[in-house]
From Swiss-Prot:
Residues 189-208 bind DNA. A nucleoside 3',5'-cyclic phosphate binds at residues 41-130. This is HTH-type transcriptional regulator ArcR. It comes from the Bacteria. GO terms for cellular component: cytosol. The gene is arcR. CDD domains: CAP_ED. Positively regulates the expression of the arcABDCR operon under anaerobic conditions, thus playing an essential role in arginine catabolism. May also control the expression of genes encoding proteins which are involved in anaerobic metabolism. Can bind cyclic AMP. One of its GO terms (molecular function) is DNA binding.
Amino acid sequence: MAGKTYINNRDNDLSEGLKQLASYLNIPTGVIQAFKSECFVRRYNKGQIIYYSSDQPTYVYLLLDGIVLRETINEDGDAYRKLNKEQLLFPLNHLFRKIELNEMCTAITPCNVIGIPKDMLEYLCKNHDDIFVTLFEKLNNELELLMEYNMALTTKLARERIEKVLYYLCHAIGYDQDEFYEIKHIMTIQLLSDLAGISRETTGHIVHELKEEKKLIKNGKNWMVIK
């Protein structure tokens, strides 16, 4: 009986995951229902690796909930970090490409993902123009965020760089609460220091200044950034 319950729960999780995928792609669930047996839903604890480099090059993933850190390594060994929250399909830049993906994805909070065969999504793109257009728009949004982060890193003044990286985080993983952005569960001075490439001590001083100026409110790892 316990085994049957587990199978039913897993099937329900997969069905719900497919509904979220269909909503993300802006298509009826029936379009992807036929591929249900080829997909999977998994839960990852904080710190677990979801994929590393070309371990699973045949899948792309929709983050159903939680926050992940993706680190891409180029030919020179430089690492590029990206933080993503729920309702994001990744790695989109792996679609229609045969090259190895030098990327590691780690769960920063507990999270659930649905894995979708890469060739299945490519097939759907080729046969449904609206899916291709949707994914193209999503990829452009991701590239715009990456450009915002890269531009923040080119800023020479420490305070200005910290502020710009904070706003990048607001746009990437924050929640718009009208008068402020809220970044939940993960924010620390060390994380901000790492992402900005500025010492922890300097980052701490700047964060203190922002708090004094009422531009930032900290509640543990939940940070509120005033617009």
